[in-house]
């Protein structure tokens, strides 16, 4: 894809799943990739796959809730590759201790709300604040945030998570609206149920069947499905696409 070969992208949450898939896809297109994650062993595994196939990538340990570690991620990327051309925000707190206690407005404890918003929403604010000045300085750049199909209100549970993702949709539009004229593109992908590491660990057959029944396709999502659209949005092939939220979920949002 145009505008990827030789350019550098930060994957903020690239140890597994969609982030790892996007890192590998970008590298296969000739891009330099900085894979950041709190799970440094997972990030290193992603990088080993990339470099083993001749790609260029580094792994950096960072935490979406820690502004200093985000600065370290940016600094490490610049030290290794000399520039930053795009950012893919994909990390979130999907731990059983947090997401597993995220249910309804009456049942979800405030500590779950605080943790969810601090990581899922403010984490993206922090990474954008760290990267955006670099993109503005060079007059171009693309940001792709990871929202969720749940932000559309189709999930009766996980209220804090879905609210954080709905706010990400607004954050995405804000960046496009305020900085688009300065060469910055900001879009979001809203995945349906993607069978990555978290879903495989939770193994919620009832949820899987619910999404599959609502889908207008014959399978659930794979990380590669999201990696393809994210890579496109980061590339110059999508240079006239800005401020959009893309639902990628087999049309499972189209309820009967």
Q: Could you tell me what each predicted segment is?
A:
Residues 2-34:
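Canonical Rossmann dinucleotide-binding motif of NAD(H)/NADP(H)-dependent dehydrogenases/reductases
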Residues 148:
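Residue(s) in the substrate-gating loop at a strand-loop-helix junction
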